[in-house]
């Protein structure tokens, strides 16, 4: 839907899933074409500019959905820039360790610089919310708990109250390319499974 040559309607890209009211516009290697074609499109001054294309594609189906989630890789490509321009809320996941926080800080500084350049070409950078989600969290890990406290002291209400726990149940379910909602609870340690599901449900409810 964001292609420069022969774009298809966004509704033709979206697929139903096994989960009620949850649809999917799957990413894939085809999106690499956008990264390669955008420099040429910029050189030729094609319209609309790259940072508007994803937002325009989503606008086609905006009335059909309450929330559209765009999952971006931790890289500053044209697709990530497009997603940040299309977004109304930004959720940043962060592992509470010194190295990960330092890496996030550097990444966000680079992102801010690039977004300022994009904004100079007319992109809108107004967000309703910008939140941090502490992920892969181990409450019994003292250093992690300290870093989580540091993040909350630094960003206050911008840090989500609930955390996404680190759990072997999540990684084990991933081995079969399933979510915890799809696997059989009996195949896991029940306490481990229940803690992981509770964590996911709490984060999801807070996001809602």
Language-model regions: role of each:
Residues 1-208:
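P-loop NTP-binding core
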């Amino acid at each position: 839907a964001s292609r420069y040559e022969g774009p298809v309607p966004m509704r033709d890209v979206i697929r139903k899933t096994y989960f009620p009211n949850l649809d999917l516009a799957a990413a894939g290697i085809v999106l690499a074409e956008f990264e390669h074609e955008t420099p040429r499109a910029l050189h030729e001054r094609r319209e609309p500019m790259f940072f508007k294309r994803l937002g325009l594609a989503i606008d086609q189906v905006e009335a059909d959905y309450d929330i559209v989630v765009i999952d971006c890789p931790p890289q500053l490509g044209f697709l990530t820039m497009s997603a940040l321009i299309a977004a109304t809320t930004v959720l940043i996941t962060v592992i509470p360790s010194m190295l990960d926080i330092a890496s996030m800080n550097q990444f966000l500084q680079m992102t801010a610089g690039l977004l300022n350049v994009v904004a100079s070409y007319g992109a809108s950078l107004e967000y309703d919310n910008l939140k941090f989600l502490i992920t892969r969290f181990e409450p019994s890990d003292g250093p992690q708990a300290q870093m989580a406290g540091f993040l909350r002291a630094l960003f206050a209400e911008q840090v989500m109250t609930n955390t996404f726990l680190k759990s072997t149940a999540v990684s084990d379910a991933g081995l079969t390319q399933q979510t915890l909602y799809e696997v059989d609870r009996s195949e896991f340690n029940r306490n481990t499974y229940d803690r992981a599901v509770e964590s996911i449900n709490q984060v999801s409810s807070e996001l809602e």
